[in-house]
Structure formats: structure tokens, C-alpha cells
Amino acid sequence: MEHYLSLFVKSIFIENMALSFFLGMCTFLAVSKKVSTAFGLGIAVIVVLGIAVPANQIVYENILKDGALVEGVDLTFLNFITFIGVIAALVQILEMILDKFFPALYSALGIFLPLITVNCAIFGAVSFMVQREYNFAESVVYGIGAGTGWMLAIVALAGITEKMKYSDVPAGLKGLGITFISAGLMALGFMSFSGIKL
């Protein structure tokens, strides 16, 4: 149990997808204007990562890994296309669920919901799972933890961006400029976790 807890904390703070690896920056910067929208997208990312990482772990271990199907047959060259296909299918299912049961959130997320399919944070988490050879339980914990870390980062940036509306930001830095500076300062804060070994 301690191993899974340390993996969860490590994936949130020490190896934060957005602020340590700088993955998923397109949606991270574009949807971080309102806390409510950022929170909704963060929940969607947690759900997708919490399902996509273990689903791809099952596919990798039982189909793609060297000798999984037939002795001597290595299908790892199909990793990228297979992982993207699984992620795309999961995002389509999530999109249909949000459209049916949460139409306000669905319309608020707009084009960024289908973009989760090609969000490099999702694919990065799946790639890290393969590289680090996580088992099924570890992949579930890692997927949920990585999604939680990404959500924590985007909600924090959205909160800062909302507060910046009431600040006297220089004209040359308004908009994306101050967002980059804020994200950079947040990343510096998260660097303080990098020396922690769990």
C-alpha cells in the first residue's frame, strides 16, 4: 500500500505532467482562463488517464509485448498507433457521456474535449507506463495520479489568471505573456519537489 501511495504522490507533485515534463501545454494554456472550465477539463483528463493508462497496459502486456501473442513475435512497433486508438475511443465515449449528462460542461470545453485525444500528457503518461514497466495496479494509480497532478496545475493557473484580471499587468504582457510567466513560476515552485525520493 505504501508503494502505491508514494507512486500517487510522486505522479502528482514530483513528476507533474504539466509543470515538470511540460506535457499537455496546448490545452493547459488555452483552457486556464476560468477555474470552473479548468476544473471540468481536469476531471475529464483524470477520467481519461485513469482508464487509458491501465487499458493500454492490458493491451501492451497481452498483445503488443514481445512474445505476448506468439513466441518470438514482437508487436511493439505498433505501440504508438495502438495507444492513440485506445485513447481516441475512450475520449469519444467520454465526449458522448458529457454531451448527454453534462451539456453545460460539454459546451464550455468546446473544441478542447476532442483535443484530449491528441493531448501529449495523455500519451506521455501511457508511454511512461510502458517505459517504467508498471503492472496493472500501478498503472491505475499512476494514471489517476498523473491526471490529478495535471488538474491541480491547470486549476491553480486558472485561479491565478482570474486574479490577474484585477491586477495592473503591463500592456505588453497581457494575455498569453503573463500566463507563460505564471506557468513558469509555478513550474519553479514544483521544482522544489524534484529532490524528494519516494
Curated annotation (Swiss-Prot):
EC id: 7.2.1.1
GO CC annotations, alphabetized: Gram-negative-bacterium-type cell wall; plasma membrane
Keywords, sorted A to Z = Cell inner membrane, Cell membrane, Ion transport, Membrane, NAD, Sodium, Sodium transport, Translocase, Transmembrane, Transmembrane helix, Transport, Ubiquinone
The entry's localization annotation reads: Cell inner membrane
The molecular function GO annotations come to:
oxidoreductase activity, acting on NAD(P)H, quinone or similar compound as acceptor
Any one of the GO BP annotations:
sodium ion transport
User: What EC class is this?
Assistant: translocase
The portions of this protein that span the membrane are: 11-31, 35-55, 77-97, 110-130, 140-160, 176-196
Catalytic reaction equation(s): a ubiquinone + n Na(+)(in) + NADH + H(+) = a ubiquinol + n Na(+)(out) + NAD(+)
Q: How does it sit in the membrane?
A: Multi-pass membrane protein
Q: What is its main location?
A: membrane
Spell out the family assignment given in the record's similarity comment: Belongs to the NqrDE/RnfAE family.
- Subunit organization: Composed of six subunits; NqrA, NqrB, NqrC, NqrD, NqrE and NqrF.
Role this protein plays: NQR complex catalyzes the reduction of ubiquinone-1 to ubiquinol by two successive reactions, coupled with the transport of Na(+) ions from the cytoplasm to the periplasm. NqrA to NqrE are probably involved in the second step, the conversion of ubisemiquinone to ubiquinol.
Task: Kindly give the NCBIfam families that the UniProt entry links to this protein.
Answer: nqrE
Write the protein's name.
Na(+)-translocating NADH-quinone reductase subunit E
Q: What is the lineage of its organism?
A: Bacteria, Pseudomonadati, Pseudomonadota, Gammaproteobacteria, Pasteurellales
